[in-house]
Amino acid sequence: MIPGELITDGPDHLLNEGRRTVTLVVQNTADRPIQVGSHYHFAETNAALGFDRDAARGMRLNIASGTAVRFEPGQQRTVELVDFAGERKIYGFRGLIQGAL
C-alpha cells in the first residue's frame, strides 16, 4: 500500500456526480507556470490566467481533492469546473466574495 492510497472493493467512485459543471478554455499569459488547487475558487485565480471569470463564479476545478492543475507559460487548455457545494459561502482567496455566492 502507498501512503494515502485508498483501496475500495466496489466500482469506481464518481466525483461530484449530479452537480452543475462548466467547461472553459484557459490561457496562461504569464511568463511562469501557474498551479491551481482542487478547491480554489476558480474565478479568483491569478489574473494572468485568461478565461470567462463570470462563468467561473462559485466554481472550482472538477478534479480529485488535494490535486491541482498546472498551466505552463503560454499554455492554453480546457478545464471542467464544478459548483461549490454546501452553504456556498466563499471567504479568503483574493477577497472578492467574502460571503454567500
UniProtKB/Swiss-Prot annotation:
Quaternary structure (record): Heterotrimer of UreA (gamma), UreB (beta) and UreC (alpha) subunits. Three heterotrimers associate to form the active enzyme.
Protein's organism: Polaromonas naphthalenivorans (strain CJ2)
Annotated catalysed reactions: urea + 2 H2O + H(+) = hydrogencarbonate + 2 NH4(+)
Cellular compartment(s): Cytoplasm
CC annotations in GO: urease complex
CDD domains per the UniProt record, alphabetical: Urease_beta (cd00407)
Pathway(s) of this molecule: Nitrogen metabolism; urea degradation; CO(2) and NH(3) from urea (urease route): step 1/1
GO MF: urease activity
Stretches that traverse the bilayer: none
Organismal lineage: Bacteria, Pseudomonadati, Pseudomonadota, Betaproteobacteria, Burkholderiales
Protein name (Swiss-Prot/TrEMBL): Urease subunit beta
